[in-house]
Amino acid sequence: MSRPIHFEIHAADVERACTFYAAVFGWTYQDWTDFAGMPYFGVESGPENQPGINGAIMQRMRGLEAGPGAPVNGAVLTMGTDDYDRDHATIVAAGGQVALPKAALPGMAWQGYYLDTEGNVFGLHQPDPHAA
């Protein structure tokens, strides 16, 4: 676990944010709303043969400030892992806190969110086609 593999930009108005980033950076989108159960648009940030990562623009969850059970007011990097439980233990031992617990993205992966020691949110993602 060391490289970002995905980002999420949280937005009050997802359509407005998608329009902005398309105009500024030329990003294109895939609508993953049905899969995510909320407005969630996969970002294709550029050609696959160029450096960079893809991500998403998603509906900001309700609340006032970042913290366990509260919304994110910014962008979130998601780190890839081949062993979610091992890296969960490492994060907690280093002083991180669970923001949203490990959950299945059915047929795709295990995903969870953490707070670092400064209150910043980051994700942890383990691909697993058998996640349920």
Outline where the language-model segments fall.
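Vicinal oxygen chelate
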Residues: I9, Q30-W32, H88-A132
